């Protein structure tokens, strides 16, 4: 459909994300324990579910993914910290059309356009259940959202902090979406909200979170180039190293090469047309 993907990899998580990382680690550890219990009971369905929940992304997996992308001729950027922040910068700079993510943090980091529910199957697995629901791609324009809400990006960040972000997962006690929006509309910023609403939370810590969203670590040193796929290297990685089905990989490679050549051909035709006009 003419989509040219650019992948962004997470770097080192910021210190202010420690609480969220600890929470996720505990979830994986609990799932791993329940997996072992399910295996002992012979409950294979539950074991499969808990195995998925306990899975961890390793450095080796990330490096393998990068090698495969290089072989496929697809560009990627290694973020120094949060991938969402790096992607938002790339979009804001005009080097990409939109961030594709399920995470609304993309908007807080300043991505001018966010696409959610971008899937091949058009379905999404429901958390903790063997059920799926149909989903349709959703596009959110940051400026349209801000205009509709009547707030600035900084105020959107403050609103999110009140509800809870990856850097303060629990948010402020007894404050939901509606109350958070009302507080921001009335008081304009975190600093001006009466302390009675903040339930003892340190305003300095909350402001630190806001500042991270506004000025996250990013790199400006990246290149975005699409190259012709190296079919032999793709097969070596997938078939020889990871035991993928050779026929399926060959078929996928044919489709990939065809897509690249059609893209390259249209690009060349566009240049030729431009030169003829000028």
Role assignments for model-derived ranges:
Residues 14, 107-109, 180:
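General alpha-helical segment detector with a strong preference for membrane-spanning helices
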Residues 130-278:
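Non-catalytic nucleic-acid-binding/docking modules located in mid-to-C-terminal regions
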Residues 99-100:
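Residue-level marker for buried hydrophobic side chains located in beta-strands
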Residues 1-93, 112-114, 120:
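Noncatalytic, basic helical substrate-engagement surface that gates or grips nucleic-acid strands
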Residues 109-112, 176:
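Active-site-adjacent pocket scaffolds in enzyme catalytic domains
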Residues 106-109, 120-131, 140-141, 145:
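Conserved NTP-donor binding/palm subdomain of two-metal-ion nucleotidyltransferases/polymerases, i.e.
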């Amino acid at each position: 459909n003419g989509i040219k993907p650019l992948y962004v990899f997470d770097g080192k998580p910021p210190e202010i994300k420690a609480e969220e990382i600890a929470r996720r680690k505990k979830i994986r550890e609990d799932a791993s324990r329940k997996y072992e219990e399910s295996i002992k009971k012979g409950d294979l369905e539950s074991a499969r579910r808990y195995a998925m929940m306990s899975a961890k992304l390793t450095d080796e997996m990330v490096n393998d993914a990068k090698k495969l992308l290089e072989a496929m001729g697809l560009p990627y950027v290694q973020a120094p910290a949060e991938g969402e922040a790096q992607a938002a910068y790339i979009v804001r700079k005009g080097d990409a059309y939109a961030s594709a993510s399920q995470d609304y943090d993309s908007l807080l980091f300043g991505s001018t356009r966010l696409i959610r529910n971008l899937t091949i199957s058009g379905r999404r697995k429901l958390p903790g259940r063997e059920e799926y629901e149909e989903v349709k791609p959703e596009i959110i324009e940051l400026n349209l959202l801000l205009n509709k809400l009547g707030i600035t990006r900084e105020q959107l960040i403050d609103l999110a902090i009140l509800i809870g972000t990856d850097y303060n997962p629990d948010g402020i006690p007894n404050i939901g979406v509606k109350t958070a929006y009302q507080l921001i509309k009335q008081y304009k910023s975190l600093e001006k909200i009466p302390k009675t609403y903040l339930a003892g939370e340190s305003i300095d810590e909350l402001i630190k979170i806001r500042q991270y969203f506004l000025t996250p670590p990013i790199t400006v040193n990246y290149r975005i180039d699409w190259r012709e796929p190296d079919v032999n290297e793709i097969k070596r990685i997938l078939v020889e190293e990871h035991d993928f089905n050779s026929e399926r990989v060959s078929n996928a490679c044919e489709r990939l090469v065809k897509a690249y050549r059609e893209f390259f051909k249209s690009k060349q035709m566009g240049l030729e047309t431009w030169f003829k006009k000028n």
